[in-house]
Amino acid sequence: MEKETKELEAVQLPENAFRELKEGEEYEPVMSPSKVYPEVNSWSVIWGILMAVLFSAAAAYLGLKVGQVFEAAIPIAIIAVGASTAAKRRNALGENVIIQSIGACSGAVVAGAIFTLPAIYILQAKYPEMTTSFIKIFLASALGGVLGILFLIPFRKYFVSDMHGKYPFPEATATTQVLVSGAKGGDQAKPLLLSGLVGGLYDFIVASFGWWNENFTSRVVGWGVDLADKAKLVFKVNTGAAVLGLGYIVGLKYALYICFGSLAVWWLIVPGMSLLFYDQILNQWDPSITQTVGAMSPEMIFRSYARSIGIGGIAMAGIIGIIRSWGIIRDAVGLAARELKGKGGSMDEVKRTQRDISFKIIAVGSIIVLLLTFIFFLTGVMHGNLLFAVVGILLVTVIAFLFTTVAANAIAIVGSNPVSGMTLMTLILASVVMVFVGLKGYAGMLAALIMGGVVCTALSMAGSFITDLKIGYWLGTTPRKQESWKFLGTLVSAATVGGVMMLLNETYGFASGSLAAPQANAMAAVIDPLMNGVGAPWILYGIGALLAIILTLCKVPALAFALGMFIPLELNVPLVVGGAINWWVTSRSKDAEVNKQRGERGTLIASGFIAGGALMGVVSALLKFAGLEIWLSDMGLSVPATWWTNPLSEVCSLIAYIFLILFFVRVTRK
């Protein structure tokens, strides 16, 4: 036992953890596949459930209030490490992975639920006949989450093992570094702790005190304001520590692809639309638009039109991804079929670190969950109409299964799931099909939103879960245990999210404007005209789809480019800054070994920035939830919100950002 403890105290990720394997080379995880380690026990399960409840509540509140859902994996990993250290638990690495895996259901379920289901409450103001309940919200989230897990498991080996070193997995990398540094203890965890403290404090000052702006824009100077107003050209960069760290881990190559997509939208399409349609009101698919294109701000043109091109690009990139992944999908289904016939290999022959839930259980489980979803649609959503329920379950099954690989792929590349874009496409497709079979009006809206909620949660869960499985692969946990206990976390998170959503609706009301819920408002804006025969921006979707095909033919990663077109500019530019730091610190020395060590140290610093920023995001959310913003203001710690409208707040932001970058570079070169 003492020997094992010493081994874990000196744990270190193998040299080949993040690079592609050479021919014949195998990856040996931190925890040996030939040994058994503590993973699932009362400690890890209770802590996992507690994390799922706490982070679901915090993420739901923050997501509905400002539209941002933080990823919970990293802060949960930090808490798990802290709790096991305080309790002096030995060999806690496997337990901490399980705590993180159960708890991380929170972010996935929250994203799935709040992107779609609040649209029911938003549309209720216009259509009082639309009603929902806790049980509907819970079932849509829970069934979608469980489907996401079941549909992803057959692709685990491909994404985490077969593609080893080919994808950056930024969030999984950061979380793994947190868990490993916690297991190491002592001096080896110092870079992570230092950067976590700096990054956390930096982002907390912005989020809670507002001492400087979170973005630096070209509007900081007079000519920049004129350029934005007249030419619709604007430059924006988020100066947060967490996004900078994310850029470092993504790397310069993928960051550039993403940023080029963003610049194509913001510097070509947005100004181009203003020039071409300056005095026209383009509201064929959204009657709420009353301004001419020329009267809009660049941000409004992006939200109203250009972003739809990104959605079309993501959808087509997803379809291309499905076509390219068809062999993997076919092999996964074939393997499941062989197991069902009893021709699969014995579980005892498979390494501990490669054991998944039996495909027989996955197949039977999928059928049961789909049957339950069908019954839910038939009795709770479609009011007993068999045709509508059958069409609904077919749409949900096909879209959720096929787009599972797209969600996992996006997380593997940028750590960001374009789930809202894919869900918007699902809603549009569902609305068109349901109207075609005769379900329209408010009843059709409710049905499409519930269906969208199931799909959205399934895709969100698939993207989140591939992160957990990659962490487990690097560290050497048993996949079957992660997969089995993920279901519990999903149910707990779904119940918590349903409760918080109803509580916030009763307290503030989604139609009041107190809750931003931007994604749900976007869904409501799209679905209302569709269900009433107005239509969708098919031309814009088509342009995005065509662009994705051209990019693919030119060997440019279409999904990364389309993600850049969909995600706001200010969140894409810092990825390039972080990627450039990565390139700089790993190429300055003539000694390859020095460059390698600096790169690894940089990964620790970046992980600390992400971890600190994410953890402080939770703290800020809890302060807002408790209403302590007024107390901070009374204490003189926070500045008035009007300060952010002052250009000087952006100047302060740029100065702080430069100091943060200099700190990053300096610490990596020690």
Residue ranges and their predicted role:
Residues 1-670:
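Alpha-helical multipass membrane-protein architecture
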